[in-house]
């Protein structure tokens, strides 16, 4: 198998052998168009900017790394911060991602949504904070989280492979948000 990347051509018996020899980032920007991905284990592979058009078994490979359900509401968790003290205190935000929200995850565990309802603000131990608590995004301090409010991101990026693109970032397990 040969794979063309921005850094040259990689060769190996199969895609797993190439990943083993060159590392998980070797596929970044790779041309995988028309590739046979049957049975390929792409967990942890960096496919950012990779061309997967017409690749064999792409839908199955994507399904294996997709962690979000395609339908129904889901609960998401994210870490945010209070700013009423220094250093800021971490806050765990419990979100309801509605069924009609745009949602995405790339190849990792971090997810994004276009809209969410703030169900609760908690300390790291899981205790609910007072209802008037405001939490702030660690990325954009103008983006706030208040219990009961519905929040939106107008410029949600629909490209699922852009993990850190615009969106409400969250995890599907609480412990991942706590440890982030």
What is the role of each PLM region?
Residues 1-34, 38, 43, 48-180:
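Intrinsic low-complexity/IDR segments
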């Amino acid at each position: 198998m040969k794979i063309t990347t921005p850094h040259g051509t990689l060769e190996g018996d199969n895609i797993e052998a190439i990943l083993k020899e060159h590392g998980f980032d070797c596929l970044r920007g790779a041309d995988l168009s028309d590739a046979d991905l049957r049975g390929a284990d792409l967990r942890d592979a960096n496919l950012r900017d990779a061309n997967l058009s017409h690749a064999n078994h792409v839908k199955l490979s994507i399904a294996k790394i997709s962690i979000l359900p395609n339908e129904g509401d889901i609960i998401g968790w994210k870490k945010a911060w209070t700013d009423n003290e220094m250093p800021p205190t971490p806050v765990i935000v419990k979100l309801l991602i509605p069924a009609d929200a745009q949602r995405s995850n790339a190849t990792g565990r971090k997810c994004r949504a276009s809209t969410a309802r703030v169900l609760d603000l908690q300390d790291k131990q899981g205790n609910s904070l007072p209802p008037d608590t405001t939490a702030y995004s660690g990325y954009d301090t103008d983006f706030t989280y208040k219990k009961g409010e519905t929040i939106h991101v107008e410029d949600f990026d629909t490209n699922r492979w852009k993990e850190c693109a615009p969106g409400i970032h969250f995890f599907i397990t609480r412990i991942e948000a706590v440890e982030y």
